[in-house]
């Protein structure tokens, strides 16, 4: 893991088109801004983990294809 120190209003670049900027530091929290291509998906880690868990759960469910077939006929 690369560890960098930045002050408020300083930034780092990831490649040539992703910039992460420290917008401010207040009450022990760091506020960051991310400038990246529009199509790039960016999530907070806890949200990303939740999405992964939901996808795993959904992939393990047994689907009754007959019920699905009925739904599409409506």
From Swiss-Prot:
It is found in: Cytoplasm. The keyword Transport does not apply. Homodimer; the beta-strands of each monomer intercalate to form a hydrophobic core, while the alpha-helices form wings that extend away from the core. This is Translational regulator CsrA. Pfam families: CsrA. Belongs to the CsrA/RsmA family. One of its GO terms (cellular component) is cytosol. It comes from the Bacteria. NCBIfam families: csrA (TIGR00202), PRK01712.1 (NF002469). Keywords: Bacterial flagellum biogenesis, Cytoplasm, Repressor, RNA-binding, Translation regulation. A translational regulator that binds mRNA to regulate translation initiation and/or mRNA stability. Usually binds in the 5'-UTR at or near the Shine-Dalgarno sequence preventing ribosome-binding, thus repressing translation. Its main target seems to be the major flagellin gene, while its function is anatagonized by FliW. One of its GO terms (molecular function) is mRNA 5'-UTR binding. One of its GO terms (biological process) is mRNA catabolic process. InterPro entries: CsrA, CsrA_sf. The keyword ATP-binding does not apply.
């Amino acid at each position: 893991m690369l560890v960098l120190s930045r002050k408020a209003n300083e930034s780092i670049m990831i490649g040539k088109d992703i910039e992460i900027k420290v917008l401010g530091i207040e009450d022990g929290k760091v506020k960051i801004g991310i400038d990246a291509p529009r199509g790039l998906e960016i999530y907070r880690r806890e949200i990303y983990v939740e999405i992964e868990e939901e996808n795993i759960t959904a992939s393990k469910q047994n689907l009754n294809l007959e019920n699905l077939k009925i739904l599409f006929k409506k």
